[in-house]
Amino acid sequence: MAQVACGIDIGGSGVKGALVDLETGEYIGDQVRIPTPNPATPDAVAAVCREVINQLNVKVGVPIGVTFPAPVFGGVIPYMANLDQSWVNVNVDELMERYLGRAVV
C-alpha cells in the first residue's frame, strides 16, 4: 500500500488540497479547491482547510502539510502579503492543529 500525505495550499484566491502518493508524487483521487474566504482571516481560512480535509476524507494518521503565502518562522507568520493582515504574529501550527484536530507541517 502506498504511503499517503495530504497537501493543502492556501492562496489569495483559493485553498487547494489533494492526497499524494509519497512514493510516486502523483495525486490520489480528486483535488479540491475552495475559494479563499473574504476577509481571509485566520479562523475563516482554517475552517476552509478543515472543509478541504473533510471533502478529501483524510483519515486519522495521514500527515498533512500546509503552505502559506508568507514566511513561517517557528510556526509564526511575521508578515502577510496576500491574506488578511490579522495573520501577522499568528501561530499557524497551533491554529491548524486546533481546526484540523492533528499536527501539521
Task: State what each model feature region is.
Residues 30, 42, 46-50, 62-64, ...:
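Glycine-rich phosphate-binding loop and adjoining helix at the ATP-binding site
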Residues 9, 25-26, 58, 96-98:
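A generic structural signal for short, solvent-exposed coil/turn residues
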Residues 40, 58-59:
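Alpha-helical structural elements of signaling/regulatory helical domains
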Residues 2-47, 77-79:
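Short glycine-rich, Thr/Ser-proximal phosphate-binding strand/loop in the N-terminal lobe
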Residues 2, 59-61:
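A general structural motif
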